Amino acid sequence: MDFAISGVTDIGIKKTTNQDSLFMCKFQTSFGEAVFSVLCDGMGGLEKGEVASASVITAFEKWAKENISFAFDNNGGINNDFVRSQWNDLIFSLNEKIRLFGRKNGVSLGTTITAIIISQKNYLIVNVGDTRAYAVTDSLYLLTKDQTLVAKEVEEGKLTEEQAENDPRRSILLQCVGASEKVYPEFFFGDVYPD
C-alpha cells in the first residue's frame, strides 16, 4: 500500500497569529511505506501558543529522525511498547520545559498535540487536547477523543451529542502540553485496512 500525505494549517477567521505547527514525513521500511505526522495547535487563549506548538513539533521531528527505525517490529507492525514509552516520556519532558519557559518569561502557553505513526499493518496515535485524527473511507471515523470539558460530560451522560455541539464550553480543554503540572496523553492503536 502506498501513502499520499498532505498538510496545511490556517490562521482561521478570529486569530491574528497562526499558532498551528505541522510535521509530516513518509519513509520506506523493509515492509513498505510508512508515515509519521504530528500536528499541534497552540493555545488560542494563551500567549505564545505558537512557541509551544513549534517546540513540540521540533522535538517530535527530532524523535522521528533518531528513532523511526526502531518504531517497527519484525513483522512490519508498529513496536507499540517502544513508541508509547518514547512518546510518553517526550510529552512529559516537553510539558515541563514549556511550563518552565512560561514561568521564566511570565507568559501562559500551551499546545494540543496529535501524533500518528502508520505502518502497512497498523497505526498508533497519541493525543493531548482536542486536535483530532480521523480515518477517511467512504465516510469519516473519529480515531481520537477530545480532552475537553464538554466531551467528558458527554462521556459521563451529563450531555447529549446534540447538546455538546452548541455548548459554549466546548472549547474548554482539560489537557494540553505546557499549561499544567501533569499531562495525561491518550493512546489509540488500530489496524490499517487497505482499500
Residue ranges and their predicted role:
Residues 1-195:
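PP2C/PPM-type serine/threonine phosphatase catalytic domain
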